[in-house]
Amino acid sequence: MKNPLRKRIPRELKGELGKYLVVFLLMVLTIGFVSGFLVADGSMLKAYNESFDKYNIENGNFRTAEKIYSSQWKGIEAAGVKLYENYYIEEDLDNGSTMRFFKNREKVNKVCLMKGEMPSGQGEIAIDRMYADNNSLKVGDTLIRGEKSWKITGLVALSDYSALFQNNNDSMFDSVKFGVAIVAPEEFENLDQEKLRYNYAWIYDHQPKNEKEEKKVSENLMEDIGKVVALETFVPRYLNQAIIFTGDDMGGDRAMVITLLYIVIVIMAFVFGITISNTIRKEAGVIGTLRASGYTRRELILHYMTLPVLVTLAGALIGNILGYTVFKGVCADMYYGSYSLPTYVTVWNADAFLLTTVVPVIIMILIDHAVLRYRLQLSPLKLLRRDFSGKKQKRAVYLSPKIGIFSRFRLRVIFQNVSSYLVLFVGVIFANLLLFFGMLLPSTLDHYQMEIQENMLAKYQYILSVPASAYSGNKEDAMNSLLEYYTDIRTDNKDAEKFSAYSLNTMPGKYKSEEIAFYGVEPDSRYIQADLSGDGVYISSAYADKFRIKEGDTITLKEKYEKDEYSFKVDGIYDYAASLCVFMERDKLNEAFDLGDDYFGGYFSDTEIKDIPSKYIGSVIDLEALTKISRQLDVSMGDMMGMMYGFSVIIFLVVIYLLSKVIIEKNAQSISMTKILGYTNGEISRLYILSTSLVVVFCLLLSLPVERQIMEVLFREMMLSSISGWITMWVDPMIYVKMTAIGIAAYAVVAVLEFRRIRHVPMDEALKNVE
């Protein structure tokens, strides 16, 4: 026999259409975004992993001062590799950026054409797609350098430049100030050949099984190549940040997005629970009659769970459809906004379906079942009498007669709806948390740039680079290279001050191992104002903050690819936020790492050093280099911040709307009675809407310190897992003002809707359910 309760479901849906529609739309948006993100993330990660074979990405590259000739070529390939030319020329453009020009590659590090056409003649160029986006360039535009110009014929992704690192030693790539491009062979010949870099890529005849084996094989290869030619640089793939950085970073946001989904689902489940409780109060007589007629508690639980579960399921299914169509593109664009990735093909993601459809439905079932089971514990007789007191009769909270009648009434409304307001508080915290994050990152990045500018060690730090030929197998060439290096790195710049440089890595653990720079400075240094005469070391404030190290602690670091470990006592913390580094006297550093008494690895200077050949300068750390991290984060996460703003306001509106609606419905009989007694709609609004208004403002203010504490944990986790280096969280006081103002403005919209609802409560409502 058919269950007659099923006939009530369409009627209940029609009667609560506004509530279910709002929740449905929120579910669709949330699940659609998360599904789209997971699908885009999985598809693009698959495309990235497959690109190594599809585009024949190099196993490494090296640079020489001169062109390799036929006999040398054969000698290198005899070491078990296939060699390819990968020459490039760098030019500074009129727009303030640097472009690295390559000939079109057809055998190794192949190019993915994203839009337009490949260059086929002189004066034509295809540029990196992300560089083009960040510099507002498109197909048909012109790039200019002095009197020379190139017409952009296409936008491309170079498979060996998925992250635009100009220098492999850089702490962060820069897709704004640096780009890569492809030109036709005849155009390449027309470029300034004095700037030509003889770069070569190699592919192993037999691929190493893992990174450890790759390290060993590459070290042997460097020695073998060094016996044949003098090396300037040597970068195996496992150390090439332009290739591996993207793969290491992709997938890191997955856990955060899934957590976002489940928090929204839990909030919606509790909102459903409260609305169901209100429905049970409203239909207590009907439920009591059904229970007395033989319907079991289980049958009623199933009935009242049906609509919430169906709405969740419908939202999940439509959200997944939108995820695979609309949101997938939105989320893919977020990745394309950070990395120079090739085209991808959407792949079915079983995890996405499980996490965005099955799990949300299970969460909804569990929470709603628990609420219904608790509410339907009352006996049929108590339900018929509308007695919801449970085992013990609750006593009303005493309120002093000295309090005005309206104030007492509002307090009663608040006390009667404590459970609804608790869920409201949780919803406000979560919505404001998203809004807080959206506002926090831009202000933190601005403050970080200002802090770096004020606390630079020197206006310029020159990190010297010993040519790879100095470590080659040919001892005579190695000695000559070393002598030439030490002769040419002397400078007449009076501002220049030598320092020793070394690097170790943090111990492996929960997060990836980080490189820590060591500065060995002069005892009377003009640039580092710290007492380094003790047995210990000073560490930068960024290092101390990131790893929560205090003065007197001991730090343990290790060689990156060796087992050797070093321990140092922290004598003090140096105010320097731009880098994770350690400071000690130069002779102590040289002795600790057996570098030799006269060794130094760089210069501090407040003026530019111009008398050292560029081939011996590994990197220059100036203001632009130090702010590269914040600049790139701002570019990469700009779209995400806008989405955070919008999403947080939507959640805030939905939660407040649903709970305010419940409170009005719960008090419909009382509102009707006050209308009979002659109170106007405005006066009734002062009783009910003003009560909720006070609670909302209180929740907004109370949530601010709670969100600050939560955000400190979340921001720290994000920085620990997503970037090398450290950016300290900084909160602009105006953020709190803006958050409160946005919250009040959003609630004002809901208050207008609730005022309309009060106006539509009929007077005959008071005559129903008269006890």
Residues of each region from the PLM?
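Short, membrane-interfacial amphipathic segments enriched in basic
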Residues: 1-7, 392-408
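Membrane transport/envelope proteins' first extracytoplasmic loop
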Residues: 2-269, 278, 332, 337, ...
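Short cytosolic juxtamembrane segments of multi-pass membrane proteins
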Residues: 3, 376-394, 756-771
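Hydrophobic alpha-helical transmembrane segments of multi-pass inner-membrane transport and secretion
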Residues: 15-44, 248-288, 306-323, 354-366, ...
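Juxtamembrane segments of multi-pass membrane proteins
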Residues: 62, 405-546, 550-553, 558
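Short coil/turn motifs that cap or connect alpha-helices
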Residues: 138, 296-297, 379, 550, ...
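Short helix-loop junctions at transmembrane helix boundaries
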Residues: 317-354, 698-765
